[in-house]
């Protein structure tokens, strides 16, 4: 029997957010956000952003316990400081790089203090916009050195690197799964992993299900963010709203590879009810998950292995789409 997945929410999306044109939702304290998550059906975890949203470790842990919640991950922000604007981990200034490394190390210490088992980091400020904008080799060496130093600190709390094609930079240095794996191979710290965000993979022109297989075959762990978009930008829509069958295949391969960590909603409820948005993510995901778990898996595997797609499509029509 395949266990129903565990769900968590990134706390940033539970309060006021903004884009270039509008602000959305009302600001909330961390305590209010945690109470909101506790009231969400099917969700029992949070990914909290360090150092801006968490407060003292003892107070955070007490609030989590009071609401019956668990820490899915601590998300360390290495882009928001003014000196990180042009890159923190890859800055040409050694002092700036050292500060970014310190942020990650302190996030690991914080995760340990609050009962978390991982830190995830998306180095969005590290990238470039133009031809001849930077020395690519130097930037890569800085990534290897800085993330390697941070990853080696407190190895019992693994550091997961999240890749993304762009934003805040025109092109992020760590912009796809293959490059993220190359980075970890160069770093050589076994207690590291990769955060796979479904939407980042989609608008990066990857197939998220294929990426799951790639990461599962690697020596590194992986951790999952769920959402959707139009394939052109990281809109962070609700799951399966734009890429239904891609999401179904993604969940199928999570099952096939034995993924048993949190599915964390990295979803932005701008114009939609916050609680309803995240409950929809959990509800739809669980229903698809259960549907996949009830399939004749041996038959489905044989069909996929035979590569006769018309036969496979008939199976999908009947058993998954119920057409």
Which residues does each predicted region cover?
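Conserved beta-strand positions in the central sheet of alpha/beta enzyme cores
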Residues: 45-47, 73, 120, 160, ...
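Active-site acidic/histidine proton-transfer and metal-coordination neighborhood
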Residues: 3, 83-193, 314-322
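Histidine-acidic metal/acid-base catalytic patches
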Residues: 1-42, 109, 117, 148, ...
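Anion (oxyanion) recognition and catalysis
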Residues: 65, 112, 255
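Glycine-rich, proline-tolerant flexible connector loops at the mouths of alpha/beta enzymes
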Residues: 44-65, 123, 127-131
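Short glycine-enriched loops at secondary-structure junctions
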Residues: 74-80
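Residues that line or immediately flank small-molecule/substrate-binding pockets and catalytic motifs
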Residues: 50-53, 78, 123, 228, ...
């Amino acid at each position: 029997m395949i266990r129903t997945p565990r769900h968590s929410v990134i706390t940033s999306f539970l309060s006021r957010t903004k884009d270039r044109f509008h602000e959305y939702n009302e600001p909330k304290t961390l305590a209010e956000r945690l109470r909101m998550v506790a009231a969400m059906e099917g969700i029992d975890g949070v990914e909290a952003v360090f150092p801006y949203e968490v407060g003292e470790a003892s107070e955070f842990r007490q609030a989590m316990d009071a609401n019956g919640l668990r820490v899915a991950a601590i998300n360390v922000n290495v882009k928001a400081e003014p000196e990180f604007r042009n890159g923190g981990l890859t800055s040409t200034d050694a002092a700036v790089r050292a500060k970014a490394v310190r942020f990650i190390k302190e996030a690991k210490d914080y995760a340990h203090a609050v009962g978390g088992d991982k830190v995830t980091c998306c180095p969005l400020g590290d990238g470039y916009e133009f031809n001849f904008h930077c020395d690519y080799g130097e930037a890569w060496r800085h990534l290897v050195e800085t993330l390697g130093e941070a990853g080696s600190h407190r190895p019992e709390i693994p550091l997961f690197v999240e890749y993304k094609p762009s934003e805040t930079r025109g092109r992020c240095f760590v912009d796809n799964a293959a490059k993220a794996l190359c980075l970890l191979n160069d770093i050589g710290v076994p207690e590291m992993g990769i955060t796979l965000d479904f939407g980042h993979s989609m608008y990066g022109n990857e197939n998220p299900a294929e990426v799951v297989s790639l990461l599962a075959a690697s020596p590194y762990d992986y951790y999952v963010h769920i959402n959707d978009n139009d394939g052109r930008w990281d809109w962070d829509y609700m799951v399966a709203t734009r890429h239904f069958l891609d999401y179904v295949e993604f969940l199928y391969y999570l099952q096939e590879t034995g993924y048993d960590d949190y599915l964390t909603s990295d979803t932005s409820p701008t114009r939609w009810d916050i609680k309803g948005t995240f409950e929809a993510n959990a509800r739809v995901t669980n229903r698809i998950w259960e549907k996949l778990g009830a399939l004749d898996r041996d038959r489905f595997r044989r069909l996929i292995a035979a590569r006769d797609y018309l036969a496979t499509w008939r199976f999908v029509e009947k058993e998954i789409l119920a057409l």
